[in-house]
Amino acid sequence: MASYTLAELAARVGGAVEGDGSLRLDGISPLEEASASEISFFSNRKYRKAFEASRAGAVVVEPDEQVAAGRTVLRVANAYLAFAKISTLFHPPREAVPEVAPTAVIHPTARVHPSAQVMPLACVGPDAQVGARTILFPGVHVADGARVGEDCVFYHNVVVRERCAVGNRVILQPGCVIGSDGFGFAFDPEGEGKGPRHYKVPQVGNVVIEDDVEVGANTCVDRATLGTTRIGRGAKIDNLVQIAHNVQVGPLSLLVSQVGVAGSTKLGMGVVAGGQAGIVGHLEIGDGVRIGAQSGVMADVEAGETVSGSPAVPHGNWLKAMASLDHLHDMRKELRSLRREVERLRADAGEDEP
């Protein structure tokens, strides 16, 4: 198992040691579980009690964090980012073992780089390409004419359908499907003499996944009706997300679990959509937009805006509306009382109701 001195870790993440820089650490653990030979991190004030009680040999903290005398810490500008980098040192990514398992199925016209690893029961179809050092876990299917770049990891039962293209350093979690048919049907009231039917619109486009993308388990990215559905460089998509045909997801965007994006909508760079947010089709969502969890986005959103609610409105307006909900019952009672009082005054004055 790898071990590092605290000073070595500081050099790797650009931090400053307070305490014993020669302290050797052999792992990283949560504050509550870390031992004297492990490092932990503290970036959320909710966990201050755990931080103060932690037995960790060292803790990653940010520059303004107050610490008790004698506590060994590694101060960094961004504790969570430093945690990620340190964790990667202790748990480096899996490296490909160049081999093709005997039960893997590689079509004679497929091109699999000699340094790639193809595990049992994985399948690479006709004219497909798999790049250097890419790992295909059991059950992966790379279909006809698909292109897979270098240093990718496709976990169990991933499907990349025909003619789709995946860039370099892409991670596809178990069960995700790239290039499933888009949901396109034209209603035919006659049904060619057989009665009304939904006529399937052929989905003949593809999907392009750019470099450094990660797609979560059981997420589906549908192929375009015509043209390309595109996931931009560095985007991260959580589990159980639905990306419809011809959607464009901008670089560095984050889509949290159960988000749904309907057809032909374009998300700009760095868009963040909270869990279960739904975005209807044919919209333009600008760069840097933030969408609250469970929001229903029904209209274009300008760059930099934050929206919440269903239908989604500017976040400040939504907060005001939510704050009013607790008072609606009392307001209703007051309104009824005022109405009765007005009716009484009109009756006393002999006025008819308007």
Swiss-Prot record:
Entry EC no(s): 2.3.1.191
CDD domains linked to this entry: LbH_LpxD (cd03352)
Pfam families per record: Hexapep, LpxD
Pathway(s) it belongs to: Bacterial outer membrane biogenesis; LPS lipid A biosynthesis
Lineage top rank: taxon: Bacteria
Catalysis performed (reactions): a UDP-3-O-[(3R)-3-hydroxyacyl]-alpha-D-glucosamine + a (3R)-hydroxyacyl-[ACP] = a UDP-2-N,3-O-bis[(3R)-3-hydroxyacyl]-alpha-D-glucosamine + holo-[ACP] + H(+)
Keywords: Acyltransferase, Lipid A biosynthesis, Lipid biosynthesis, Lipid metabolism, Repeat, Transferase
Keyword Cytoplasm: no
Coiled-coil region list: none
Gene Ontology CC, one term: membrane
Any one Gene Ontology molecular-function term assigned to this protein's record: N-acyltransferase activity
Location of the active site: H245
GO process terms (BP): lipid A biosynthetic process
Subunit structure, interactors included: Homotrimer.
Record function comment: Catalyzes the N-acylation of UDP-3-O-acylglucosamine using 3-hydroxyacyl-ACP as the acyl donor. Is involved in the biosynthesis of lipid A, a phosphorylated glycolipid that anchors the lipopolysaccharide to the outer membrane of the cell.
Recorded family membership: Belongs to the transferase hexapeptide repeat family. LpxD subfamily.
Official protein name in the record: UDP-3-O-acylglucosamine N-acyltransferase
